[in-house]
């Protein structure tokens, strides 16, 4: 036999597999009707374990890993089909539908907005991209921004979530597990760092540089060229610029924005010192209540999964089975649980798609703890 003969044999086997798979799914549909009539849940974990064990007993040892992966996917597809036929369960899809109906058609042009830092911060630039006429209130910490939303001091809050060079803002992710909020929009801001100092200062005389840890990370290559300079972290790039201006010293500088240069009367000793030219930070806009504006095509979730093998795989398989694209997966350790994590997901799917509604009805059953953070669009 030559290669073409082997391929024809594979084609013949595939024809049989398709017919058998269709037959299996038809039987799964009958099981779904039985479960509907008898008030049974779609997922029967014990049955799946027993079935997988029986399959492994019948499978040659060198193929068990492959058969296990194959049937894990078949089980997932079967559950997805049954869930689709039985309709969504739980109250989350209904809450989302209600929010879509009650949310105004247009995103607000003006609002009270909480930001971390001081005037000139990149968060302020994000506010101005999101709102035409924001009333911006500055707070000393990320946690204070979350608290301002929870207490009703501001309707919205703007927080940095990730940077294209330095990665995730871990402090914000950790706080997300501790507060009640909803994401209503996001925006990407181009970040251009400059070395700012008081008028008359010279680069060769600089002994200390202040900035936020993310900015320091984004300018690592530039800072390596200044080995005798002490780099000091502070709360915010705008705070760093203000500290330098208020110090009156000619031997200190800040990594900050051009806006802060003009705002605080500083000179730029070096421009665009970030490692990557295309350096963007993604900010989220949070609110106390769920607001879903037209065009929402991104959804954020947090989950605590059962602490056993395959838990994350089952969630990812559910995304795959429904054709939902995942843009981001982040894990953060949970302080009160040894070696357990909170998983953060960004999904790309329209809130109007039937697979989105089905997914929101199914996911809570796969988790120990599930948080729907919101569905929104991103300003780019």
Where are these regions (language model features)?
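Domain-level signature for soluble enzymes in the chorismate/prephenate branch of the shikimate pathway
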Residues: 1-380
């Amino acid at each position: 036999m030559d290669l073409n003969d082997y391929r024809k044999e594979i084609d013949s086997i595939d024809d049989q597999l398709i017919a058998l798979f269709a037959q299996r799914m038809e039987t799964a549909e009958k099981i779904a009707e039985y479960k509907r009539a008898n008030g049974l849940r779609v997922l029967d974990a014990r049955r799946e374990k027993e079935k997988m064990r029986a399959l492994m007993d019948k499978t040659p040892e060198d193929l068990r890993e492959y058969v296990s992966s194959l049937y894990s996917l078949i089980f997932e597809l079967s559950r997805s089909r049954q869930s689709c036929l039985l309709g969504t369960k739980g109250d989350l899809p209904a809450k989302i539908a209600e929010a879509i109906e009650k949310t105004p058609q247009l995103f607000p042009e003006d609002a009270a907005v909480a930001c971390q830092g001081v005037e000139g911060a990149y968060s302020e630039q994000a506010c101005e991209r999101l709102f035409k006429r924001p009333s911006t209130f500055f707070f000393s910490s990320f946690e204070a921004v979350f608290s301002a939303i929870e207490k009703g001091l501001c309707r919205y809050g703007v927080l940095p979530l990730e940077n294209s060079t330095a990665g995730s803002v871990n402090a914000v992710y950790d706080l997300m597990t501790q507060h009640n909020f909803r994401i209503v929009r996001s925006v990407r801001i181009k970040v251009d760092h400059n070395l700012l100092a008081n008028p008359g200062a010279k680069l060769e005389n600089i002994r200390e540089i202040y900035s936020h840890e993310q900015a320091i990370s984004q300018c690592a290559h530039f800072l390596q060229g200044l080995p005798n300079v002490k780099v000091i972290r502070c709360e915010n790039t705008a705070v760093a610029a203000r500290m330098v201006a208020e110090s009156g010293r000619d031997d200190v500088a800040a990594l900050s924005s051009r806006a802060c240069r003009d705002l605080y009367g500083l000179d730029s000793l070096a421009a665009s010192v970030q490692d990557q030219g295309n350096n963007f930070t993604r900010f989220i806009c949070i609110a106390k209540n769920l607001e879903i504006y037209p065009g929402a095509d991104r959804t954020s979730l947090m989950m605590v999964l059962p602490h056993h093998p395959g838990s994350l795989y089952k969630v990812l398989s559910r995304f795959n089975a429904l054709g939902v694209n995942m843009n981001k997966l982040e894990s953060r350790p949970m302080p009160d649980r040894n070696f357990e994590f909170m998983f953060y997901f960004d999904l790309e799917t329209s809130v109007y798609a039937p697979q989105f509604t089905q997914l929101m009805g199914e996911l809570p059953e796969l988790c120990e703890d599930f948080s729907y953070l919101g569905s929104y669009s991103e300003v780019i």
